[in-house]
Every structure is written in C-alpha cells, then in structure tokens.
Amino acid sequence: MTNKEIIKRLYHEIIPYKIPLFIAMFAMIVVAALTGAQAYLVKDLLDKIFMEKDVFFLQILPLIIIAIFFTKGVLYYTYAIILERVGQSIIRDFRLKIFAHIHRQSLSFFHNTPTGTLISRVLSDVALMQQAVSTVIIQLLRDFFQVIFLLGVIFYMNWKLALICFLIIPLAAIPIVKFGKIFRKLSTKTQEETAEVSNMLHETISGSRIVKAFCREDYEVERFHRQVETLFTITMKNAKYRVFQSPLMEIIGGFAVAGIIWVGGSEVINGSATPGTFFAFLTAMITAYDPVKRVSQVNSTIQQGLASAQRVFAILDIKPEIEDKPEATSLAPFKESIEFHDVSFSYGTEKILSHINLKVPAGEALAIVGPSGGGKTTLTNLIPRFIDLQEGSITIDGTDIRDVTTNSLRNQIAMVTQQTILFNDTIRNNIAYGKDSCTEEEIRRAAKAAHALTFIEELPNGFDTALGEGGAKLSGGQRQRISIARALLADAPILILDEATSALDTESEREVQKALENLMQNRTTFVIAHRLSTIKNASRIVVVKKGKIVEEGSHEELLKLEGEYQLLYNMQ
C-alpha cells in the first residue's frame, strides 16, 4: 500500500469531522496572519521608534503587541483543543472499528494470527497513528499557514533576499525525503519486533505454570532478553537517523542566515534598505525556518504513523471467511431436527470430515466418540458456523444454516468446553454473560442448577467475587460449573459439550456431571467425550474415525459389534 493510498483512506476517516476542522483551520489562519504581522512590526519598531523617534508610535505599539499576543493565545487554545478532540475521536473510531472487525472473523483467523500481534495492532499501532494524525493536523497545518504568511511578509519587504530563502527549501527537502524512506522501513521493522515482544509476553505469562513446572524461568528471561535487545537495536538505529536530521537542518539554516546577513547588510550599508526592513526580514525568515525544521523532526513520527496505518488497514482488509448472505433470514425457534447431508471438510489438503450423513431429532443426546484427531470437534464446530463446510449442507428444521444470520443461529446454541473460558469479572457477570438482560433470581437459579450455588455463597463476596484472569481464583470443577450456569441461563435449545469433564478429578467430575444432566434436560445435545463412562446413557452414540462415522448405536449395541467402540471402551 503506497503513502498516497494510506493518506486517502485516512482522509475518509477525517471527513466526518470537517466542520470542527474548518473552524480550527480558520483560527490557524488568523494566528498565522498575526505571526506575520509580528515579524513586520520589527521594521516599524526599529525605523519609527529608534530611527525616527516617533513618540506616538511608541505609545500605541505596546497595545498592538498585547492585542496580537492575546488574540493568538485565545485562538491557539481554540484550535488546539478542537484538533486534539478530532484526533482522539479518529483514533477512538479506529480502535472500535478494528476491535469489532477482529471479532467478526472466523476461528481460523485467530488460529493463524498470534494474540500478541492483534493486541499490538489495537494498542501500539493505533497509538502511533494517533501521534501521526495529531502531528499532521495540529503541527503541520499550523506550520503550513505560518510559513505562507511569513513568506508573504518576506517577499513584500525584499523579493531579492526572499529568493535566497527559497534556495533553502530544496536543500531542506533532500534529507526529509531521504530519511523518510528510511524511517518508514525502520518503523515497520520496529512494530514487527514490538508485536513479537507482545506475543512472547502473552505466551509466557499465560503459560506461567508450565514455565515454572519445567524450571524454564531463566530460559524465558534469556529468550525475552534477546527479543528486547533486537528491538533496542532497531529503535536506536531509528533514533540515530532522527537525531541526525536536527543538526543537519541547523547547518543548512546557518548558511542561509549567513547569506542573508551578507546580502542584506550590504543593502543597509549602501542605503538601499533600512535597518528596520533588514531586521524585520531576518526575523520573518528565522521564524519561517523554524516550521521547516520541525517538518524534519516530525518526519519520523509521520512515517511511523503511516507504517502503523498500513498494518491496521491490512487487518481491516481481511474479509471474514463467514459472512451472512445479503438475503439471510433469522432462524426460527428449533423444533424438529438437525441434519448433516453428505458433509465434508478439509484443512488445506488434509481431509478432516468425509461424507458425513447424520440426523439428530430434537431432544436427543448424541454422543460423539473416537480417536484423537478423528474430526469430532470439527463436526460440532460446523453447527454454529465457527468454520464453514466445503461440501454438503447442514440443516436445522430443513433450513440450511448458511441461509440464516449467524447471530440467530448461535443464539440457539450453548457450549461448554474442556477449556473453560471465564472473564476477569465477577461471578455474577460471568454467569449473566450468556443473556443480555436477566434478573438476580435467574442467575441464582442457574447457579443452583449447575451445582455452583453452595460454593459461591461460601465465598466472602458471593456473586460479587472477582474471578481473576481465566477464573484463576477457582478450582477446575468450580470454573466448569460457572460455565455450565452460563449455558443454563442462555437457555438455548441446542447444546454442545466438548470434553466438558475430561480435565477434572473424580470428585469434581461427579459434581459437574450432575450439573450437566440438569443442563441437558429438554435440549438437543452433542456430547464429545473421551471418558466413555460419561456417555453410557446417551440416546445414541456415533464413532468417528478418520473423518467418517464408522459405528452408530446405543452403548450396549456398540459393545455387541465388537468393533471400534469396544476397543475404545476396553482401553479405559
């Protein structure tokens, strides 16, 4: 993506704020005009007061200066606060947009994109964009108008000397353009390494138990040291180029001032210019050169912002793999059956499911068993469209799930998985997460049905207990029962249980199993289980091996077949 394309897209984000921007730009123009007037007043200060001894002008000049500075101060505050608000609003919009876009992606997006990278895009990259947007809107626009008015003053006073000033601009532009390309490249590398640091932090902190279990603290510290050392090296390289610009611009400016003093001083000596005109010109030129120098100083910030914007837009340009059709309708309440019609699915070239045909009547508890990697979880992930099938179709009451909105589909499905996901919030809010609005009584009923009410009430803060990240303050069985309470409160007619008890000890499993039995009542349930003892009472059991259903029947029927199910059963 070129700079022009990035700027064009950023421009479209700014358009909604055009009215406050116009107000701020008007204030900037007035401030710039007053800055030009300040420079011009140096001429009258020297010529009329010091040379001509004009007493009247001496009396009114201080009042004029006070009026100019007061007006500039008021207008500066006006445009600065407006532009700060606009800049922050644009960044807020970007954060909301990228956050919403990320959550519209399918599961494969999260499998392929490291968490630290996504965090870096939302926080670090957008923050750098904010700096660039604020710099461009506030500083560059202000400096642009200031330079225009000061150049007008310069040409008005002495066009010959003004031409010398114009020789500076091409010289000053060379390092700005040259270093701009370097900054862009280094900024991209810096943000890539920053994302790697974020990834490493996320992995090691979330996996702290494994790090400690294998005594790998020193190893991880050394690995992190290497990563931050790489980031340090790139950052310092960026800093060297950035800092080098300032003295370079000072040297160029020094030559320009020396030339103007030599030419302008000669004109004063031979009488073709007054001292006031010369010093006013010099003041205007030095004042105008400051914004030119600032362009070189902020060039690094702008290039970092453009590189960050490119990465943010790259995320925003990723189309979700699963989107509602334009003509998609809401799924009617589930009543009859869920059917798989010749369903196949592959990850790349690897076939995971092959020609699955299955009908699950409403109210049935279907257990899905089989060796690891056989396709059990993939089969259930197709129902809520976490992934999309590639061949065949899945229908609910005869309606293809691809013809309905994903929200209406998922609203009729509840899940309890082996990996219990709880948020760093209170127990109450974690249970209520499954329903937009619910009463305290509904939350308590769900907790009671999930066999969680007793231990919740024993906690010092009860339902207001903060769980910590991932529910770290609870045991595995307690976390799972909170998850079951959440599913109960959602009251969805379709239930998916994916290894819901496999990570629990016997006592915890017993409590969770009771809660699951309550949850499964009057629901159509898909149960994935390795512990076959937990699914003996299932209405039907299907054995999935290498992506195919190889056996189907009740527990007793499958044992009589003396096939795959019996092998699995005997292994336990």
UniProtKB/Swiss-Prot annotation:
Cellular-component GO terms for this entry: plasma membrane
User: Which compartments is it annotated to reside in?
Assistant: Cell inner membrane
Enumerate the Gene3D superfamilies for this protein: ABC transporter type 1, transmembrane domain, P-loop containing nucleotide triphosphate hydrolases
TM region positions: 14-34, 55-75, 148-168, 249-269, 272-292
SMART domains in the record, alphabetically?
Answer: AAA
Membrane topology reported for the UniProt record: Multi-pass membrane protein
**Record's keyword terms, sorted:** ATP-binding, Cell inner membrane, Cell membrane, Lipid transport, Membrane, Nucleotide-binding, Translocase, Transmembrane, Transmembrane helix, Transport
Pfam name, any one: ABC_membrane
- What the record says about its domains? In MsbA the ATP-binding domain (NBD) and the transmembrane domain (TMD) are fused.
Q: Report the family membership.
A: Belongs to the ABC transporter superfamily. Lipid exporter (TC 3.A.1.106) family.
Role this protein plays = Involved in lipopolysaccharide (LPS) biosynthesis. Translocates lipid A-core from the inner to the outer leaflet of the inner membrane. Transmembrane domains (TMD) form a pore in the inner membrane and the ATP-binding domain (NBD) is responsible for energy generation.
Q: Provide the assembly information.
A: Homodimer.
- In Swiss-Prot or TrEMBL terms, this protein is called ATP-dependent lipid A-core flippase
Per the UniProt entry, what species is this protein from, by scientific name?
Desulfotalea psychrophila (strain LSv54 / DSM 12343)
What are the top taxonomic ranks of the organism? Bacteria, Pseudomonadati, Thermodesulfobacteriota, Desulfobulbia, Desulfobulbales
